């Protein structure tokens, strides 16, 4: 984890599947806020139950080692197609970890979205 993000993570954090084939890293505090939001959803909805089940079954608590590294579980590495080079970036309330290849594929989509949103 780049040094600029280590202090905000503190000692422990949670890794989970993110959108678009990346891994999200949450502080314990932000993970707790997400859990509280999920509790407000209608648990009687099968799609919501399935989403929550998948999210929690593939989430993993982790601790930074003395060099600021985390062990990424095999299921998350496989999901994010991470095998070599990474891109790590801050994204508001979380850190995103991407396969460099997948991250670069999204560049053209990003430019198109900026134009679509008038930015």
Residue ranges, per PLM feature:
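Flexible "stalk/tail and boundary" regions
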Residues: 5-11, 15-61, 66, 75-119
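Active-site beta-strand/loop microenvironment that shapes enzyme catalytic pockets
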Residues: 72
């Amino acid at each position: 984890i780049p040094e600029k993000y280590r202090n905000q993570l503190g000692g422990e954090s949670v890794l989970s599947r993110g959108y678009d084939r990346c891994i999200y890293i949450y502080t314990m505090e932000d993970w707790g806020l997400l859990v509280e939001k999920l509790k407000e959803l209608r648990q009687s909805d099968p799609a919501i139950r399935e989403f929550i089940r998948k999210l929690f079954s593939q989430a993993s608590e982790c601790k930074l080692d003395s060099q600021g590294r985390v062990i990424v579980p095999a299921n998350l590495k496989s999901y994010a197609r991470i095998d070599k080079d990474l891109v790590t970036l801050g994204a508001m309330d979380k850190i995103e970890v991407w396969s460099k290849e997948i991250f670069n594929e999204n560049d053209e989509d990003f430019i198109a979205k900026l134009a679509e949103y008038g930015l």
